[in-house]
UniProtKB/Swiss-Prot annotation:
Family classification: Belongs to the anamorsin family.
Alphabetical UniProt keywords: 2Fe-2S, 4Fe-4S, Cytoplasm, Iron, Iron-sulfur, Metal-binding, Mitochondrion
A cellular component term, taken from the record's GO annotations: mitochondrial intermembrane space
Intervals of motif Cx2C motif 1: 77-80
Principal subcellular localisation of the protein: cytoplasm
Region span, Fe-S binding site A: 39-51
Protein name: Anamorsin homolog 2
Binding site for [4Fe-4S] cluster: 77, 80, 88, 91
GO biological process, one term: iron-sulfur cluster assembly
Motif Cx2C motif 2: chain residues: 88-91
Segments for region (Fe-S binding site B): 77-91
Length: 115
């Protein structure tokens, strides 16, 4: 089975459309990929840390200083309490369960039996 390249056709003129003519200069600019994960939302540096946090922690431990956990920033989208399905990509609460927004991020478990 051979695969032929597909062509786009105009519905009005039934002529082949030049796909390169549809792109603007802004579309042609190669955008730099954003880093998906980093150490800012974790208690310790990642195993494969590339941001420099692992070196900083080792240096502080060698000097005898306490490594302080960074403060978790409040999310800007307002959906942090709803759960991962509603959180933005940079949410500091990714991976954590949904919580009641009025209880300072503490998780309330419903331990009652539903039978």
């Amino acid at each position: 089975m051979s695969s032929k390249p597909t062509q786009a056709f105009s519905l009005k003129t039934r002529q082949a459309v030049d796909e390169d003519a549809l792109l603007t200069e802004e579309d042609r600019v190669v955008k730099e990929a954003t880093k998906g994960e980093d150490c800012t939302t974790r208690r310790r540096a990642c195993k494969n840390c590339t941001c420099g946090r692992a070196e900083l922690e080792r240096k502080m431990l060698a000097e005898g200083k306490k490594v302080e956990m960074p403060q978790m920033p409040a999310g800007g989208c307002g959906n942090c309490a709803k759960g991962d399905a509603f959180r933005c990509a940079t949410c500091p609460f990714l991976g954590q369960p949904a919580f009641d927004n009025t209880s300072d991020g503490k998780v309330k478990l419903n331990l009652t039996d539903d039978i």
